[in-house]
């Protein structure tokens, strides 16, 4: 909330909306960049340094143009749901099937004409109110309903394929199950199947989202279970006897 992201998220007539995933993930990736920058500096100077990291600031930078708009124009952007200040149509549209959606974004009049052609030029696409982008913005709510009257007849994947083939920005909104079965994600091996004594034999974890051509990343083992390396650390690294370690375990000091 203190990053400003919640205040920007939601619909104009609704309250600020909390993002449903943990921001710690973004903070972790941002910290990784800071660590790498410090290591590069150490290679050149031979000196290490402390990193003063702010989780809040790592999220605030996601606001992008909203921060720039205020810095340059003194204008505070407000919540606008899925609407965009420039692109229209710009929304998530219901598709065939239960809770299936597709995101469509039209950036200019040329893309609008491509969309109209791709969906068969139904009568409403010839309405003068939708001919120009500035006019489409004024009537965007009605336009959204009309676009959805077409998307509802197809699956989200079908809509994506039809519109992308016409050069229109469209992508199926995927749920967690879709992510695991998506052909593109499978081809990239975005999820790796691991074996874990607690999670089971087919426990999938996300692989790094970057692919290096010369030194590819790999996940070679599952995460350790709680206490898995207690005896190794205490005996091999701290030089305690197995009897001492066992006593500490019995006393509840270790596990």
Label the predicted regions.
Residues 89-166, 170:
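Aromatic-enriched alpha-helical interface/lid elements that frame and gate functional surfaces
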Residues 165-220:
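A glycine-rich dinucleotide-binding beta-alpha-beta segment and adjacent secondary-structure elements
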